[in-house]
């Protein structure tokens, strides 16, 4: 998620940047291995040779994150295949970069002294998790993070699982876990397979067909919006939403203007000189954004979409500050950690 736009919001809305310093973000794929096989995985589905290599020397990682801190990075987005499988790399980042978010499937608990926010992905209820991901890991993830203030559970909605939202919300409620929503966004590979132009076997395309299509077709985005609002009214202490953002991200038309290659020209998550995406072998990714396998036409994941929303804040003068507060609630440091960061910022100024 491009910090150029997040940082502007931090300065203008709520004063977070004033208290803890400038937010400068970058994305790091710290792992190229995973213990699940999610249908249409945004990391592996259609990936190139870059996912086949990884830097395994922890001293190299430690020096790398030190150099990133010296470059001015203050907020790390840690992802890849499954970052919790490389806890030493998480720690190496945490020792140098003060804030961050880890995107994980929750099957391996991240140690409690790592004070980054932890976003745990869910793809459906107990019954369907194995279909979507190759294993039913919901309960394990929820037990790992029960009552953990760092954790935010993220249900990826698709055209097939909207009726499962109440089950997931109830399970999160029972485990003291907040729930937010993302929208399934097909990779270029997924779209090619659904159109019949790619046929080779893939661990990340197992059950999808014309009768089992996870993509949001006509009117399905409106159904997703209504399902989110209905669930939020039923589980107000568990579900966290920004109504303005939900209304925007579920609008029927594409969120983006595309160039002749099908690449979004008005995406708030494009890589820049400062906002960089590194692969697991520590090479600098030269693609369009931190999720280059996604088809820009249908791109609606929550983190990337929030960056784009902030980049268009002049188009939403009455709403963007509330959306920024939503970002801060789910991505920003916890109140007790924010105070420590504020004290640290004062000591270095």
Protein language model regions, located:
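Flexible mid-to-C-terminal extensions adjoining Fe-S/redox cofactors in radical SAM and related proteins
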Residues: 2, 8-17, 22, 267-349
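Processing junctions and N-termini across compartments
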Residues: 28, 32-35, 261, 290-293
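Canonical radical SAM enzyme core domain
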Residues: 48-63, 80-140, 155-167, 183-193
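Short glycine/proline-enriched coil/turn segments at helix->beta-strand junctions
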Residues: 70-74, 94-100, 108-117, 146-151, ...
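Radical SAM enzyme [4Fe-4S]-AdoMet core and its adjacent flexible, acidic
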Residues: 121, 127-261, 265-266, 278-281
């Amino acid at each position: 998620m491009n910090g150029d736009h997040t940082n502007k919001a931090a300065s203008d809305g709520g004063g977070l940047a004033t208290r803890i310093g400038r937010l400068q973000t970058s994305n790091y794929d710290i792992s190229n291995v995973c213990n699940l096989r999610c249908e249409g995985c945004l990391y592996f589905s259609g990936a190139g040779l870059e996912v086949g290599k990884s830097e395994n020397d922890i001293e190299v990682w430690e020096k790398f994150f030190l150099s990133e801190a010296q470059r001015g990075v203050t907020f790390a987005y840690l992802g890849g295949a499954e970052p919790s499988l490389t806890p030493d790399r998480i720690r190496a980042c945490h020792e140098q970069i003060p804030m961050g978010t880890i995107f994980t499937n929750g099957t391996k608990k991240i140690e409690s002294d790592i004070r980054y926010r932890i976003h745990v992905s869910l793809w459906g209820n107990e019954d369907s998790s194995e279909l979507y991901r190759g294993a039913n890991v919901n309960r394990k993830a929820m037990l790992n993070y029960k009552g953990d203030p760092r954790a935010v559970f993220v249900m990826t909605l698709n055209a097939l699982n909207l009726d499962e939202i109440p089950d997931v919300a109830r399970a999160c409620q029972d485990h003291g876990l907040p729930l937010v929503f993302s929208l399934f966004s097909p990779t270029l590979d997924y779209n090619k397979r659904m159109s019949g132009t790619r046929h080779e076997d893939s661990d990340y395309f197992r059950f999808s067909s014309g009768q089992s299509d996870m993509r949001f077709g006509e009117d399905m985005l409106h159904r997703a919006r209504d399902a989110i609002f209905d669930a939020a009214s039923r589980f107000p202490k568990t579900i966290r939403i920004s109504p303005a953002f939900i209304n925007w991200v579920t609008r029927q038309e594409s969120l983006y203007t595309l160039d002749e290659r099908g690449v979004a020209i008005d995406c708030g998550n494009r890589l820049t000189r400062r906002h960089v995406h590194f692969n697991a072998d520590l090479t600098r990714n030269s693609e369009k954004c931190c999720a280059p396998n996604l088809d820009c036409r249908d791109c609606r994941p929550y983190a990337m979409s929030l960056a784009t929303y902030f980049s268009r804040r002049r188009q939403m003068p009455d709403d963007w500050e509330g959306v920024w507060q939503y970002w801060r609630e789910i991505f920003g440091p916890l109140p007790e950690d924010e105070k420590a960061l504020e004290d640290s910022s004062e000591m270095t100024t």
